[in-house]
Amino acid sequence: MFNKNFWTSIIIGCLFCTITYSGVNAAALDEETRTVALNSTETVVLTPEQVKRGKRLFNSTCGICHVGGITKTNPNVGLDSEALALATPPRNNIESLVDYMKNPTSYDGSEEIYDIHPSIRSADAFPKMRNLTEEDLYDIAGHILLSPKILPSQWGGGKIYY
């Protein structure tokens, strides 16, 4: 039926496509794309290194539950720009996301959820949060805010994309 060379070619082709198209190179992003909200009135330009670190830290620390900007435990609340802006308080800037990673609250802001959501405050129960620095949280927040610019329909778009 199919010979060994056929399957080898298929595997090599798949690996090539995966490596070539696996993501956007941080150095290739222009300054405008790397500009995100620092707080409600100021913006900041992430460095290519912050972009890379933020993605790596997000994937290793948050990606289990938030792969692709979704929330596995509550598919109604994602990490897309609209959901972050509509949260109470809004979580659509670096400072507010860092605050959330330190002391998370429910989407409507009515109750603290550090006992069920990983955070710096609950690092004893969620060991992946234990060694994160302020700089790490900043870079993770930057990744969350940058991702909708890079993957506009996929980030937070749900399982139809992943």
From Swiss-Prot:
Do the record's keywords include Iron?
yes
A single BP term in Gene Ontology: photosynthesis, light reaction
What membrane topology was assigned to this protein in its record? Answer: Peripheral membrane protein
Q: Which Pfam families match?
A: Cytochrom_C550
User: Which is a Gene Ontology cellular component entry for this protein?
Assistant: photosystem II
Q: Cellular location of this protein?
A: Plastid, Cyanelle thylakoid membrane
Provide the primary localization.
Answer: plastid
Which PROSITE patterns is this protein grouped with?
CYTC
GO MF, one example: heme binding
Which stretch is the leader sequence? 1-26
Cofactor binding note: Binds 1 heme c group covalently per subunit.
Q: Does the keyword Nuclease apply?
A: no
Q: Alphabetically list the UniProt keywords.
A: Cyanelle, Electron transport, Heme, Iron, Membrane, Metal-binding, Photosynthesis, Photosystem II, Plastid, Signal, Thylakoid, Transport
Q: What cofactors does the UniProt entry give for this protein?
A: heme c
SUPFAM superfamilies referenced in this protein's UniProt entry, alphabetically: Cytochrome c
- The UniProt record gives the binding positions of heme c as C62, C65, H66, H117
Which family is annotated? Belongs to the cytochrome c family. PsbV subfamily.
On subunit structure and binding partners, the annotation says: PSII is composed of 1 copy each of membrane proteins PsbA, PsbB, PsbC, PsbD, PsbE, PsbF, PsbH, PsbI, PsbJ, PsbK, PsbL, PsbM, PsbT, PsbX, PsbY, PsbZ, Psb30/Ycf12, at least 3 peripheral proteins of the oxygen-evolving complex and a large number of cofactors. It forms dimeric complexes.
Function description = One of the extrinsic, lumenal subunits of photosystem II (PSII). PSII is a light-driven water plastoquinone oxidoreductase, using light energy to abstract electrons from H(2)O, generating a proton gradient subsequently used for ATP formation. The extrinsic proteins stabilize the structure of photosystem II oxygen-evolving complex (OEC), the ion environment of oxygen evolution and protect the OEC against heat-induced inactivation.
Q: What is this protein called?
A: Photosystem II extrinsic protein V
- What is the originating organism of this protein? Cyanophora paradoxa
Q: Corresponding gene?
A: psbV
